[in-house]
């Protein structure tokens, strides 16, 4: 059963400009340490760094929409992090207010599953999030 869907499209150059202007202050406010480490491994190619951050920014926006709150009502940027499963498939790891909202949306006896798709084609990055409730006994995440 689908309990939330969200999508977001962002201009990668917008994220690059914000990073240039605000640097670590912006990165620390929006991105988890795991996300920053992943982008840091691409530091030899500035366009890849910006695209990496833009995809994760779009994923957070899409996730907040799937949660039905946007970035408010106790759901903050760093409560949502893009992590990779074995094999590289991205998903969202929720903490704090985002986790509380997810738990509130998930019906009793069910487990939430978050499916994430992220992509980029310069100068755009895009993310889709689908949150499903699946029977607890068959949950994969």
Swiss-Prot record:
Positions bound to Mg(2+): 8, 61
Disulfide bridge positions per record: none
Function in brief: Transfers the 4'-phosphopantetheine moiety from coenzyme A to a Ser of acyl-carrier-protein.
InterPro entries named in the record: 4-PPantetheinyl_Trfase_dom, 4-PPantetheinyl_Trfase_dom_sf, ACPS, Ppantetheine-prot_Trfase_dom
Keywords: Cytoplasm, Fatty acid biosynthesis, Fatty acid metabolism, Lipid biosynthesis, Lipid metabolism, Magnesium, Metal-binding, Transferase
Keyword Cytoplasm: yes
Enzymatic class: transferase
Main location class: cytoplasm
EC number annotated for this UniProt entry: 2.7.8.7
Cell location: Cytoplasm
Cofactors that this protein relies on: Mg(2+)
A single BP term in Gene Ontology: fatty acid biosynthetic process
UniProt cross-references to Pfam families, sorted A to Z: ACPS
GO cellular component: cytoplasm
SUPFAM superfamilies: 4'-phosphopantetheinyl transferase
Record GO terms (molecular function): holo-[acyl-carrier-protein] synthase activity; magnesium ion binding
Catalytic reaction annotation: apo-[ACP] + CoA = holo-[ACP] + adenosine 3',5'-bisphosphate + H(+)
Family assignment from sequence similarity: Belongs to the P-Pant transferase superfamily. AcpS family.
HAMAP family assigned: AcpS
Protein name per UniProt: Holo-[acyl-carrier-protein] synthase
């Amino acid at each position: 059963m689908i309990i939330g869907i969200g999508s977001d499209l962002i201009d990668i150059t917008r994220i690059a400009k914000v990073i240039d202007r605000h640097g670590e202050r912006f990165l620390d406010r929006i991105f988890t340490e795991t996300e920053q480490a992943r982008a840091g491994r691409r530091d030899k190619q500035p366009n890849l760094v910006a695209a990496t951050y833009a995809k994760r920014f779009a994923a957070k926006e899409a996730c907040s929409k799937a949660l039905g709150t946007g970035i408010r009502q106790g759901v903050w940027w760093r409560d949502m992090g893009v992590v990779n499963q074995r094999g590289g498939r991205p998903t969202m790891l929720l903490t704090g207010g985002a986790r509380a909202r997810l738990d509130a949306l998930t019906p009793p006896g069910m487990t939430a599953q978050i499916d994430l798709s992220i992509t980029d084609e310069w100068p755009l990055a895009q993310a889709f999030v689908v949150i499903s409730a699946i029977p607890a006994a068959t949950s994969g995440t």
